[in-house]
């Protein structure tokens, strides 16, 4: 406990950066590193420290150091589910490099590093004649984020294929393998906490035909191009409530095309928010708040956001009515959803019910 009840002093970030750089063999350490540039919104401030982790040994070293120092840790994946406050993130952001992106296929079993990109992995599995991961071609995130939030779309999700995940624990400093049951994957949720870092996973797919799986991927890509916008966005902003679609509810509440400052609700899909180049995270958050308010006023339904909100004042977020993932304010910045329920067409429909 600090003397006289004073809060602990802020870390000396440049000094910590030098200390980490001396301990790590193949990782880059940067002070005041822009996080917004690493997200698909392209808005937001800096992390006090960013470590681009280059080896498994460095990751273990960081986990041990973090367990002692009690850092506030943020893991940044592909940035496709991340909104960073304009004031930035008061902690250490981690980004796994391509050293954690390797994937290998043995029979119908696929082992992949946490930094592997889902669309790339989905296409590779289809080319190998394996089925079960085709839906992931439309989820622009990494494997690590997919596990943390049970990514899904088109009637399937990670729970359907995952067998285990190796997890580094930045609270204890250790690492161990979690079985599927331990991960407790639900609709866009899991048992993983902010101090857990996915390192590697194994998925069990099924034998299929290359032509069949590649045609499925072509149909999913075409469907998404018709029904979802491009631009600077993070995909689905809100999770679908049971039996309904967040996009339908937002549209019914008159939110399509709604704009606050530099952020606007897509005119293509009302569950997507797009940020202008050079815009602000506060505008995006204000627009999210307004959409949620209008939906609740119109339908009585309280939407749960899917976006990882980082660096915002947590009490203020709760005052705004956000009742989202446990990682509000310091979560895992990786894509977690491709939309489901009535939000997207199921695999059976895409295949003409040939399954």
Please state what every model-predicted region is.
Residues 81-82, 122-125, 133-137, 147-157, ...:
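A generic local secondary-structure boundary/capping motif
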Residues 30-31, 39, 43, 82, ...:
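Phosphate/pyrophosphate- and phosphate-bearing ligand-binding catalytic cores of soluble enzymes
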Residues 4, 340-342, 349, 354:
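Low-complexity, intrinsically disordered or signal/transmembrane-proximal segments
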Residues 6, 318, 335, 351-353:
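Basic polycationic patches enriched in arginine
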């Amino acid at each position: 406990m600090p003397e006289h009840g004073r809060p602990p002093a802020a870390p000396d970030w440049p000094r910590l950066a030098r200390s980490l750089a001396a301990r790590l063999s193949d990782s880059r350490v940067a002070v005041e590193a822009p996080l917004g540039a690493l997200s698909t919104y392209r808005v937001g401030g800096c992390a006090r420290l960013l470590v681009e982790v280059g080896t498994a040994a460095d990751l273990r070293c960081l986990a041990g150091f973090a367990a002692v120092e009690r850092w506030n840790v943020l893991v940044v994946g592909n940035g496709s589910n991340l909104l960073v406050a304009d004031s930035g993130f008061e902690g250490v952001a981690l980004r796994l490099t391509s050293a954690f992106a390797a994937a290998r296929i043995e029979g119908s079993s696929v082992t992949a590093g946490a930094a592997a990109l889902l669309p790339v992995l989905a296409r590779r599995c289809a080319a190998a004649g394996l089925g079960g991961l085709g839906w992931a071609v439309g989820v622009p995130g990494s494997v690590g984020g997919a596990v943390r939030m049970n990514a899904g779309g088109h009637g399937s999700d990670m729970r359907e294929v995952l067998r285990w995940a190796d997890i580094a624990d930045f609270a204890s400093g250790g690492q161990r393998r979690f079985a599927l049951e331990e991960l407790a994957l639900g609709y866009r949720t899991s048992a993983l906490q902010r101090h857990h870092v996915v390192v590697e996973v194994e998925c069990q797919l099924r034998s299929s035909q290359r032509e069949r799986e590649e045609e499925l991927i072509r149909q999913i890509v075409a469907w998404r191009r018709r029904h979802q916008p491009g631009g600077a966005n993070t995909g689905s902003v809100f999770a679908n409530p049971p039996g309904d679609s967040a996009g339908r509810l937002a549209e019914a509440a008159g939110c399509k095309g709604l704009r606050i400052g530099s952020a606007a609700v897509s005119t293509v899909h009302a569950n997507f928010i797009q940020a202008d180049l050079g815009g602000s995270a506060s505008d995006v958050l204000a627009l999210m708040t307004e959409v949620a308010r209008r939906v609740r006023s119109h339908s009585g339904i309280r939407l749960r956001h899917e976006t990882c909100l980082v660096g915002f004042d947590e009490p203020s977020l709760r005052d705004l009515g956000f009742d989202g993932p446990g990682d509000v304010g310091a979560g895992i910045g990786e894509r977690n959803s491709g939309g489901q329920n009535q939000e997207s067409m199921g695999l059976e429909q895409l295949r003409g019910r040939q399954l």
